[in-house]
């Protein structure tokens, strides 16, 4: 479950709650500055989702908030930016052509980035409009089109002639004729794209599956669903569920008591207060059980941004209709429920003079929107011209800045300009408040940045690099998977020939999840190859088991030395010192009561920010390890000694792998996927390329530009919000996700985690 700021609206975000883990960065209402007069801007990530992926729209959300602040905009949904007014300026470095694969393949070379930027997250592969998605820069359109600019007038919604039905996204998806209920259901691929919980997904181990049949028809019943949440010490938890049947009849409207201490009731959005929730005894498990009893096997759940509701409920259901996607706008725009209710149904909901949302009203509204769509069809919806209506509403709104969709518009509203330094501007439109400087090389971009960046409140500094050739990228990706597998595999022995294999498995499994134990047949005395799920477990086995007496034998525990593990010790050491892993410890051998025991003795673990407790995929049983994240490195070390002591008798060590890295490694496919029928001349393989390290080799490029960005970073003034984006790559042969790193620069010497 993710922790969000007190004023973050539940339905404003795109990234779902984490079902497995939570980062409990100290929220703004719990931060006490030792000297109130010395407030500083600070970042506090919430570790967003299970794979720590942040969408491009969410990046834009954060950047807009960095410019305008909470007086005009809602707070970001996926992280906390504390004391935004103390920011001096914003600098976004874009390393075009680089991806998460670059960063972890050349992890040792990116020394400055990994040691300095504590907050890292995955990015989806870039679209063709990457800059537009995060900043508001738009590619030039053909002469037949009408390019939209910051200065350009907004289209009038009252002119029927202005409606372009053919290019309306609803028409493009559904056509002109009325559609059936089953046609409106989200496909499995769409559910995956929009982060719905799915059976078998690594982030849904502890979710329950609602009963469902393999047959669904156009007569299957619809049920409107809406949830409200609060913020607790374990993140975001359910406080109210509303379920409505067709006809508007309310089947369920239950208050729910969270399992953990409530930090913020989010009353302005949920309407829930301490007094309301105090007498409640209903728990999440009770709601889950009731849903399984109430809903028939062919039930279709309907909601607005329904993925968020399902995740907070920790349920999986294959039959869903999401009104934010049913009434989709251009470029994937998702309209607010209040807007659709007013335009389509002609009614006002979530009135500003009313405290909190009415869950029944929201669920009923979503249900009515689906029924309207089914009755009148896509053509009728397209004729509303939702894009134009929304644009007019935003233009006429006195608080229009709240609805601004681009960073450029936010800057323009404050009379400020954006500086854009790049080699590639030919395909971009010009904007009155964007000063673009075209450079001939990355080196010139760097030189211009040193001079120009201090003069502008918002800066985009884009360096361009040649992406990896497809086959080279595939080989590197496969090598990465192999390297981590080999690093997570240990060899233990020799044992006696009559050793108890079950006993050995139990001993080694106590250090972390084991994927396989294999008897090595090439040795005279038995050795075992043990592959762990986590690098931490393998490293812990080497550190604690090597040289011990087991089954009557003194054993050696070590890794196999291969080309890919030659620098394993160095890599482990550097991973341990990664700023994201500082303050995080890995603990093995825990039982089901560990969490309760931990909370009961919380006084022994000051500065505890996160408890990460993964569960088994099928049984939903808690695994025998966890990660504990602390505010400081010192607090983590104190806690580690306590947990390894005589009272707790657990084993552990400093963390090595962040959650986004674990998720990325799991998703690396071993075989390349290429279009059929294409004959490709393979480039030189990686091992041959590395024999001659030329100046433009990726390894040298990574090292050189990490150093150059370091120098540029140190030239920035304190209070600068620095965001580094490796956007990822996307082409005919496949895609590679990107990586984001962010930090607010402090005074020199104050940037390290103590």
Swiss-Prot record:
Its EC number is 3.1.-.-. One of its GO terms (cellular component) is nucleus. Residues 222-370 form the Exonuclease domain. It comes from the Eukaryota. It is an enzyme of class 3 (hydrolase). One of its GO terms (biological process) is rRNA 3'-end processing. InterPro entries: Exonuclease_RNaseT/DNA_pol3, Nucleotide-bd_a/b_plait_sf, RBD_domain_sf, REX1-like_exo, REXO1/3/4-like, RNaseH-like_sf, RNaseH_sf, RRM_dom. Gene3D superfamilies: 3.30.70.330, Ribonuclease H-like superfamily/Ribonuclease H. Keywords: Exonuclease, Hydrolase, Nuclease, Repeat, RNA-binding. Coiled coil: none annotated. GO terms for molecular function: exonuclease activity; RNA binding. Residues 1-36 are annotated as: Disordered. It holds the Pfam family RRM_1. Residues 488-562, 583-662 form the RRM domain. This is RNA exonuclease 5. It comes from Rattus norvegicus. The gene is Rexo5.
